[in-house]
Amino acid sequence: MVKHSKGYRTRSRSLLRKSPRERGAVPSLSKLMVEYKEGDNVVVKINPSVHQGMPHRRYQGKVGKIIGKRGRAYLVSVTLGDKEKVIIVRPEHLVPFNSSG
């Protein structure tokens, strides 16, 4: 028997994959220049081509609230189960949350 790996990116084969048309593309400058303010709601959308400031895959698709800034990255408060977690994420992995309603 062989032990299965328990690395940081395990079980992320389909999650951290781009479509063939997007492959190799770096994030657009307009996406990097977005300034978030404290209290803004954002969605964590991992960009697999940018490794810096990448959150763990368990936060993919989660909606959080900006609570501060640390260097180029943002502090995002995310609800995970019944707990509030604070993660440090760079803007390449964030998308503004637009609630319809």
From Swiss-Prot:
Q: Where is this region: Disordered?
A: 1-24
Question: Compositional bias of type Basic residues: which residue ranges?
Answer: 1-18
Q: Which GO terms describe its biological process?
A: translation
Q: Which GO terms describe its molecular function?
A: structural constituent of ribosome
Q: Which family does it belong to?
A: Belongs to the eukaryotic ribosomal protein eL21 family.
What does UniProt give as GO cellular component? Answer: cytosolic large ribosomal subunit
InterPro entries the UniProt entry points to: Ribosomal_eL21, Ribosomal_eL21_arc, Ribosomal_eL21_CS, Ribosomal_eL21_sf, Translation_prot_SH3-like_sf
Cross-referenced HAMAP family: Ribosomal_eL21 (MF_00369)
**Matches recorded under NCBIfam families:** PRK04306.1
Q: Which UniProt keywords apply?
A: Ribonucleoprotein, Ribosomal protein
Query: Is Ribonucleoprotein included in the keywords of this UniProt record?
Result: yes
Concerning Gene3D superfamilies, the annotation shows: Ribosomal protein L21
Species, as recorded: Saccharolobus solfataricus (strain ATCC 35092 / DSM 1617 / JCM 11322 / P2) (Sulfolobus solfataricus)
Protein name (record): Large ribosomal subunit protein eL21
Superkingdom, natural source: Archaea
